[in-house]
C-alpha cells in the first residue's frame, strides 16, 4: 500500500468511502456487489475505483474477499458524512426544506462542498450534533460522539 499523496480525494472517491463506511457498520468487510448496489453503479466499475482508493491508502481490497477502509479511509469517510449531514441540517433549519427534500438535495450538493463551506454552514445552523434524521454528526476531527440511544 502506498502512502497517502496529500491530494484531496475526488467527489466520487469520497462517495465510495462514505458508502463503504456505512456498509462496514454491518460487516467488517464489504462485498463489491453490495457496494455496487448501494452506489447504483455497474459491478465492473467498482474494482477500478477500489484500485484508485487503494493506491492512495484509503482501502484494503482483496479480490473476491471484499474491501475495508484503512484508518485514513475511515477519516475521509467521516469527513464526507459530516459534510452530508451538516448540509441536511442547513437545508432544513436555515432554508426550510423538509427532511426528505433535504436528503435528496444533500445527495446532489454535498460532492461540491469543501471544508470551509461546510464549517460555515455548521456555524449558521448552530453547530448541530445530529442530522434531521437523528444520526450523529462527526466532529471536525472525524470523531463520532458516543450515542447512548435506547430503542423503545
Predicted regions and their residues:
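A short, conserved structural fragment
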Residues: 54-62
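Basic, amphipathic "hinge/linker" alpha-helix immediately C-terminal to the N-terminal HTH DNA-binding motif
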Residues: 65-84
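Key DNA-contact positions within bacterial/archaeal DNA-binding proteins
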Residues: 44, 100
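Mid-protein regulatory/catalytic core that forms ligand/cofactor-binding pockets
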Residues: 110-152
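Extreme N-terminal segment that seeds HTH/winged-HTH DNA-binding domains in transcriptional regulators
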Residues: 1-40
Amino acid at each position: 500500500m502506498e502512502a497517502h499523496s496529500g491530494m484531496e480525494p475526488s467527489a466520487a472517491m469520497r462517495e465510495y468511502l462514505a458508502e463503504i463506511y456505512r456498509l462496514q457498520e454491518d460487516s467488517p468487510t464489504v462485498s463489491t456487489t453490495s457496494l455496487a448496489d448501494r452506489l447504483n453503479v455497474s459491478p465492473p466499475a467498482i474494482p477500478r475505483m477500489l484500485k484508485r482508493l487503494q493506491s492512495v491508502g484509503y482501502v484494503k481490497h482483496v479480490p473476491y474477499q471484499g474491501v475495508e477502509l484503512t484508518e485514513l479511509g475511515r477519516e475521509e469517510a467521516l469527513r464526507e458524512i459530516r459534510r452530508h449531514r451538516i448540509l441536511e441540517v442547513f437545508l432544513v433549519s436555515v432554508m426550510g426544506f423538509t427532511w426528505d427534500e433535504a436528503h435528496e438535495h444533500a445527495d446532489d450538493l454535498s460532492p461540491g462542498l469543501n471544508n470551509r463551506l461546510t464549517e460555515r454552514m455548521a456555524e449558521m445552523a448552530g453547530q448541530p450534533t445530529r442530522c434531521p434524521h437523528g444520526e450523529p454528526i462527526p466532529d471536525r476531527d472525524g470523531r463520532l460522539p458516543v450515542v447512548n440511544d435506547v430503542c423503545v
